[in-house]
A protein has these predicted regions:
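N-terminal, non-cleaved signal-anchor transmembrane helix
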Residues: 1-139
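Alpha-helical membrane-interface segments at transmembrane helix boundaries
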Residues: 80-91, 131-143, 166-169, 173-176, ...
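Transmembrane-helix boundary motif in ABC transporter permease subunits
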Residues: 102-108, 118-132, 144-173
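Juxtamembrane membrane-interface segments at transmembrane alpha-helix termini
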Residues: 127-138, 152, 212-219
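Generic hydrophobic transmembrane alpha-helix motif, especially the helices
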Residues: 140-143, 147-160, 170-207
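Short helix-to-coil transition segments within interhelical loops
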Residues: 176-179, 219-223, 229-249
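Hydrophobic/aromatic residues within the transmembrane alpha-helices of Major Facilitator Superfamily
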Residues: 179, 191-192, 204-208, 215-219, ...
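Transmembrane alpha-helices
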Residues: 201, 205, 237-271
Length: 274
């Protein structure tokens, strides 16, 4: 057995020992707390009274609102301006133009069946007298998806180029995906006000993780042989990324765009309430 293997085995044993000792200490402390408390079904108040987590969170929220609300409201004004411009365009445009904008890309990429479905959908919006609210939802959805794709692809590219950045981003993306929408929907409303801005921000948080993950995955899955061949012809890092890796990762990136659209659609209906 080599020296490296011995070191790896020792490191693994040390980690296991630390893990089991930690489990034992936590279990012993929990058992002690359950014994000293009169009611074993209630956590000891001697700890909860000292650890005023809710009060700390409320104090932090009040501090941020009092001192930094102007920053969030300034950012919200830019988002709101973009949303209102897109909404006004959709609402004031002829319905036949909106139908064409929906049907022509569908015809080009999905065929005649998808184009007919899009035309029927647009016609249905008008037939049930839901045209204006449909255009508002379409504007909110469109801006959210565009921003999600832009920032998601950028973060995915950065993540693919740095293992450290990827490890930093992973727990954040996991939190964004598993956290219920209401958890960040209402704080966004408090900081950014009522309107399109908090709805767009909440949709961004919910819809960005798939495009970030799949962009990162697609670039990292480009074969080493392809990269070595490009390097042998003198390609630098910039050329490798934008002329080799990203074009070859496009199927994965487009899958991320698909998932982002679905995630945004799932939340945009809820977000319209604010």
């Amino acid at each position: 057995m080599s020296l490296d293997q011995n070191i790896a085995i020792k490191n693994k044993l040390n980690k296991n020992i630390i893990f089991y000792i930690s489990i034992f200490i936590i279990g012993a402390v929990a058992y002690y707390l359950s014994i000293i408390n009169e009611d074993p079904t209630v956590f000891p108040k001697s700890i909860t009274d000292e650890f005023k987590f809710t009060a700390w969170i409320n104090a932090g929220e009040d501090y941020l609102k009092d001192n930094y609300r102007w920053i969030t409201r300034l950012f919200a004004s830019f988002l709101q301006a973009g949303y209102m411009a897109l909404e006004n365009f959709f609402v004031e445009s002829p319905w036949i133009l909106i139908m064409s904008l929906m049907a022509l890309p569908a015809l080009a990429y999905g065929g005649i069946k998808l184009a007919l479905f899009c035309m029927f959908t647009v016609y249905f919006w008008g037939a049930v007298d839901m045209w204006e609210v449909s255009m508002q939802t379409l504007a909110l959805m469109g801006l959210s998806v565009i921003l999600s794709v832009i920032f998601g692809v950028i973060l995915g590219i950065l993540s693919s180029q740095s293992d450290r950045f990827e490890n930093f981003l992973k727990p954040i993306l996991d939190t964004m995906q598993v956290m219920p929408a209401f958890v960040y929907l209402f704080p966004a409303m408090f900081f950014f006000g009522i309107g399109g801005a908090p709805a767009i921000l909440a949709t961004l948080i919910y819809a960005m993780p798939p495009i970030i993950r799949l962009t990162n995955l697609g670039i990292r899955q480009v074969s080493k042989e392809t990269i070595e061949s490009a390097e042998s012809f003198g390609s630098n890092k910039f050329q490798l990324l934008f002329k080799i890796k990203i074009p070859m990762a496009l199927p994965s990136i487009m899958m991320g765009v698909n998932q982002t659209i679905m995630m945004a659609l799932a939340l945009v209906v809820l977000a319209t309430f604010i």
